[in-house]
Amino acid sequence: MRTDKFNYYLDIAETVLERGTCLRRNFGAIIVRHDSIISTGYTGAPRGRCNCCDLGYCRREQLQIPRGERYELCRSVHAEANAIIAAPRSEMLGSTLYLVGRDMKTGELVPNTSSCAMCKRMIINAGIDKVYIRDDEANYRVISVQEWIDNDESLDMIEGY
């Protein structure tokens, strides 16, 4: 049976996450416009810096920082940010971002995840219209970026992944 295009792109994002270097959670993101992949991104340290998988430890884990908090202490650039950095804004206007995350300890997909507050801001400013997030092999959610604009969670202190 032929895979629908949403799962096709989510499958590609899931493959992209395999390049990730985080010891806690790896994410893969792809940006698609007019059924063409504009760019890809995965979780990893900035170019030229050591990755956590090379160092053998995660600073946030050592400090027992819970998921969704204190990202300024993380070595990695998030998958969404890396995908956005790699694409010109003119090609992202009206595009769709596909996002998949995997917990590196369990090997399971990260259910009910969402982009962190900083990545949401980048997605908004990039001009991306929709975000598809895979929850498990059979289910995904579609988020209208306009919802993130209208419901400014930075006013409510709600966290992302």
Describe the residue ranges of each PLM region:
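Zn2+-dependent cytidine deaminase-like catalytic core
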Residues: 3-7, 39-161
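Short beta-strand scaffold segments in enzyme catalytic cores
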Residues: 26-40, 132
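Short, basic/aromatic recognition patches
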Residues: 1-26
